């Protein structure tokens, strides 16, 4: 008798994706982040759904509705902090996942990589709009500053900003539409994830060596199902530690003050996961230039596959590229730190140097290192 999982069309899809999927035998813990991102997305959709049951997207009541969730709703505080810190875990996993892709040359799967970049943009947009919803000081001013960047677009800028706002400033219309978009986008993200996986399963997974592993495959279940479950446990443990011990560690105290258009906070800054891009934006004195640098800081990922000069796919056997990769990681951490600092003397210069270094490593130094490594191989 044919196994039940191999005949019904739906179970067949599940079987080919999660059970009988041939996977490389040597993929490390860096390959866990894909499934962890799936878990994060599910946590966010579920907690978000329950928050939306009690939230009101109106400037007069938004802030107090969040307070009501935390004080009066059964386990409302838990749902709210799971959602807020779940976003942080989401971005930690995202950056690790992208970093893995760069280190091991996974970007050579062009379709998967490009869908991944679209996913990254979609998640960033969702997180930004979600941050506006509690309608605290940082929500309001963050929305004002970031949407205002679009006014740098020549000719149509101002019109575009007012169109997004639904008026002449960030107000009720803006909050309502941001809530609508924040609700719908995660489901679009879920659909994109399916396409991401569809393209990945066309080629199969990469592995740390970067060498085709067709001759050495193992079934996904039980080997990688149990490995993913271990990853889930670690992620949930870290998330619960954050939520139950210091839920406001990564948040901004200013967001506990209701939004006031007449009072600007001393330091307007986004959530920690956007600080590196914010630092790049601020390091350029020109508005349009800053916006272009901001967009390019993420869009540069799309150029990486075309800058791959090495004869090897992975960085596993490329020491010069490895050093550059870890300098890039340190540079991103530096930018994250600078993004949270005031615009004052040493920080401005550090930010500018770090921004130049960021683009230089990706566009110039890494391709050069690859060419040098190719020469060393010949020699």
UniProtKB/Swiss-Prot annotation:
Record text on cofactor binding: Binds 2 heme b groups non-covalently.
Gene3D superfamilies linked: Cytochrome Bc1 Complex, Chain C (1.20.810.10)
Swiss-Prot/TrEMBL cofactor(s): heme b
Function as written in the Swiss-Prot or TrEMBL entry: Component of the ubiquinol-cytochrome c reductase complex (complex III or cytochrome b-c1 complex) that is part of the mitochondrial respiratory chain. The b-c1 complex mediates electron transfer from ubiquinol to cytochrome c. Contributes to the generation of a proton gradient across the mitochondrial membrane that is then used for ATP synthesis.
Record's protein name: Cytochrome b
Keyword match Cytoplasm: no
Membrane topology: Multi-pass membrane protein
Subunit-level organization: The cytochrome bc1 complex contains 11 subunits: 3 respiratory subunits (MT-CYB, CYC1 and UQCRFS1), 2 core proteins (UQCRC1 and UQCRC2) and 6 low-molecular weight proteins (UQCRH/QCR6, UQCRB/QCR7, UQCRQ/QCR8, UQCR10/QCR9, UQCR11/QCR10 and a cleavage product of UQCRFS1). This cytochrome bc1 complex then forms a dimer.
Membrane-crossing segments per the record: 33-53, 77-98, 113-133, 178-198, 226-246, 288-308, 320-340, 347-367
One of the Pfam families matching this protein, by short name: Cytochrome_B
GO cellular component: mitochondrial inner membrane; respiratory chain complex III
Residue sites binding heme b b566 per the record: 97, 196
Listed GO MF terms: metal ion binding; ubiquinol-cytochrome-c reductase activity
Similarity comment: family membership: Belongs to the cytochrome b family.
GO biological process assignments: mitochondrial electron transport, ubiquinol to cytochrome c
Alphabetical list of InterPro entries matching this protein: Cyt_b/b6_C (IPR005798), Cyt_b/b6_C_sf (IPR036150), Cyt_b/b6_N (IPR005797), Cytb/b6-like_sf (IPR027387), Cytochrome_b (IPR030689), Cytochrome_b_C_euk/bac (IPR048260), Cytochrome_b_N_euk/bac (IPR048259), Di-haem_cyt_TM (IPR016174)
Principal location class: mitochondrion
Binding site for a ubiquinone: 201
Residues bound to heme b b562: 83, 182
Keyword vocabulary terms for this entry: Electron transport, Heme, Iron, Membrane, Metal-binding, Mitochondrion, Mitochondrion inner membrane, Respiratory chain, Transmembrane, Transmembrane helix, Transport, Ubiquinone
Misc: Heme 1 (or BL or b562) is low-potential and absorbs at about 562 nm, and heme 2 (or BH or b566) is high-potential and absorbs at about 566 nm.
Family matches, as PANTHER family: CYTOCHROME B
């Amino acid at each position: 008798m044919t196994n039940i999982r191999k005949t019904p069309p739906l179970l067949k899809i599940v079987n080919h994706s999660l059970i009988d999927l041939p996977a490389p035998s040597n993929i490390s813990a860096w390959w866990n982040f894909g499934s962890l991102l799936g878990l994060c997305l599910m946590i966010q959709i579920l907690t978000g759904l329950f928050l939306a049951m009690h939230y009101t997207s109106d400037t007069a009541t938004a802030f107090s509705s969040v307070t009501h969730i935390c004080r009066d709703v059964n386990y409302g505080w838990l749902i709210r902090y799971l959602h807020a810190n779940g976003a942080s875990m989401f971005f930690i996993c995202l950056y690790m996942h992208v970093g893995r892709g760069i280190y091991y040359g996974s970007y050579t799967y062009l379709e998967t990589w490009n869908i991944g970049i679209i996913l990254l943009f979609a998640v960033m947009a969702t997180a930004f709009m979600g941050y506006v919803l509690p309608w605290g000081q940082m929500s309001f001013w963050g929305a004002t500053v970031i949407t205002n960047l679009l006014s740098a677009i020549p000719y149509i800028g101002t019109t575009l900003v007012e169109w997004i706002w639904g008026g002449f400033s960030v107000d009720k219309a803006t909050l309502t539409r941001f809530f609508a978009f924040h609700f719908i986008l995660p489901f679009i993200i879920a659909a994109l994830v399916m396409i991401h996986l569809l393209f990945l399963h066309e080629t199969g997974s990469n592995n740390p060596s970067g060498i085709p592993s067709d001759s050495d495959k193992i079934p996904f279940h039980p080997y990688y199902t149990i490995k993913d479950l271990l990853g889930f446990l670690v992620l949930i443990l870290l998330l619960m530690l954050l939520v139950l011990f210091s839920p406001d560690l990564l948040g901004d105290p200013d967001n506990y003050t209701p939004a006031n258009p007449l009072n600007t906070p001393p330091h307007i800054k986004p959530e920690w996961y956007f600080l590196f891009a914010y630092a790049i934006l601020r390091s350029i004195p020109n508005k349009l230039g800053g916006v272009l640098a901001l967009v390019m800081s993420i869009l540069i990922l799309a150029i990486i596959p075309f800058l791959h000069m090495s004869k090897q796919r992975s960085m596993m056997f490329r020491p010069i590229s490895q050093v550059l990769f870890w300098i890039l990681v340190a540079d991103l951490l530096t930018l994250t730190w600078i993004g949270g600092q005031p615009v004052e003397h040493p920080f401005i210069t550090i930010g500018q140097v770090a921004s130049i270094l960021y683009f230089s490593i990706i566009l110039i130094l890494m391709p050069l290192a690859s060419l040098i490594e190719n020469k060393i191989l010949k020699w």
